[in-house]
């Protein structure tokens, strides 16, 4: 017969330290805490990594313009600190690590991209400002698509403007506005990343991307029933900012053996019509009595803006080709002073008044509206 006392003595005491079960309460709690603690993300401190990797405290491989993690997650990659001395300079081409739409995005459709490229080549290119001239039309329909194949920002800008044009031609096709917005957002984001490192290979494409973005934003403003002054001033800043981009690109390619494709656009740029400050039929937009709020510099800025509106209106009345008038309309920010834009952003009444007249005056032209849509 089994001795019950011997059996009991053979069972280890629950308080014994010879078994994992024998730990006291504090040791067990410590053990459980260690067990529950999640894996720690490996990282090293980086002063020049992108914003997102620094915020997450993970190692950034500092690939430019888009690091590995941001590319994997399909999110914008922002470098807000200059690279350390001796660091590898950032790549200027976006194609090495492209920012692509997510698989669920409606624009991530090869068939749609082919359709947009086809539409741009055959139809949208013919509506570009200045396309009444054969060399300008050929530039938009032949040279620009070719450049876009090796420069993602330009390719996405082409898709965006084609989708916008298609949405005007086929207003019942519901998905086009979203596709347009998606490609426009990608083009803007990528363009900002690339303009800091223009090369002889990308100079042409950078300039054409800048023009397409200006046309797209302007056409979008035209199609809105209500346009805020903030949107107008943003468009004006975008147009004026493009001058610095063009200057940088032209400086880089000026020693090239062959002239850049963008030169045909620059060469046909409409000259200012205004030779004086004649406001003509728009003189009612100017102050008749002095105002303590505005000094002589501000008054001159108002006169210049109104004189340009009047001069362009007279050119339209004289049957200037609608495509030329269209270009004048879109480069209005280049023909006014920076001071006028500052006054507009400060919401000075006399700066606010000319802008609606500028849009209304040309909005009445059906041909112009078609060419900028």
Curated annotation (Swiss-Prot):
It comes from the Eukaryota. One of its GO terms (cellular component) is nucleus. It is found in: Nucleus. CDD domains: GAL4. The keyword Metal-binding applies. InterPro entries: Fun_TF (IPR021858), Zn2-C6_fun-type_DNA-bd_sf (IPR036864), Zn2-C6_fungal_TF (IPR052400), Zn2Cys6_DnaBD (IPR001138). Residues 33-48 have a biased composition (Basic residues). Residues 50-77 bind DNA. It holds the Pfam family Zn_clus. Residues 1-48, 86-110 are annotated as: Disordered. One of its GO terms (molecular function) is DNA binding. Keywords: DNA-binding, Metal-binding, Nucleus, Transcription, Transcription regulation. Zn(2)-C6 fungal-type transcription factor; part of the gene cluster that mediates the biosynthesis fumihopaside A, a hopane-type glucoside that enhances the thermotolerance and UV resistance of N.fumigata. This is Zn(2)-C6 fungal-type transcription factor afumD.
């Amino acid at each position: 017969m089994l001795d019950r006392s011997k059996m009991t003595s053979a069972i280890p005491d629950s308080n014994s330290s010879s078994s994992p079960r024998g730990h006291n309460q504090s040791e067990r709690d410590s053990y459980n805490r260690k067990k529950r603690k999640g894996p720690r993300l490996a990282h090293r401190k980086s002063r020049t990594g992108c914003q997102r990797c620094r915020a997450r405290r993970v190692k950034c491989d500092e690939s430019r313009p888009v690091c590995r993690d941001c590319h994997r997650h399909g999110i914008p990659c922002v470098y807000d600190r200059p690279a350390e001395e001796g660091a590898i300079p950032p790549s200027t081409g976006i194609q090495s690590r492209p920012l692509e739409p997510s698989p669920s995005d409606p624009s991530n459709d090869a068939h749609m991209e082919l359709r947009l490229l086809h539409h741009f080549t055959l139809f949208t290119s013919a509506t570009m400002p200045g396309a009444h001239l054969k060399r300008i039309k050929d530039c938009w329909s032949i040279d620009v698509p070719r450049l876009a194949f090796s420069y993602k920002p330009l390719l996405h800008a082409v898709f965006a403007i084609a989708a916008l044009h298609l949405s005007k031609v086929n207003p019942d096709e519901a998905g086009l506005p979203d596709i347009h917005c998606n490609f426009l957002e990608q083009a803007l984001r990528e363009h900002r990343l690339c303009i800091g490192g223009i090369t002889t290979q990308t100079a042409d494409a950078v300039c054409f991307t800048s023009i397409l973005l200006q046309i797209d934003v302007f056409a979008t403003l035209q199609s809105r029933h209500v346009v805020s002054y903030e949107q107008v001033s943003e468009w004006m800043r975008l147009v004026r900012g493009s001058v610095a981009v063009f200057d940088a690109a032209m400086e880089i390619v000026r020693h090239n053996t062959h002239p850049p494709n963008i030169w045909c656009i620059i060469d046909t740029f409409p000259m200012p019509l205004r030779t004086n400050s004649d406001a003509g039929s728009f003189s009612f937009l100017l102050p008749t009595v002095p105002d303590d709020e505005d000094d002589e510099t501000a008054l001159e800025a108002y006169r210049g803006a109104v004189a340009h509106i009047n001069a362009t209106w007279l050119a339209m009345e004289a049957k200037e080709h609608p495509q030329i008038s269209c270009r004048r309309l879109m480069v209005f920010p280049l023909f006014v002073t920076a001071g006028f834009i500052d006054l507009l952003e400060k919401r000075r009444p006399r700066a606010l008044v000319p802008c609606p007249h500028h849009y209304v005056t040309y909005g009445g032209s059906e041909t112009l509206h078609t060419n900028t849509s």
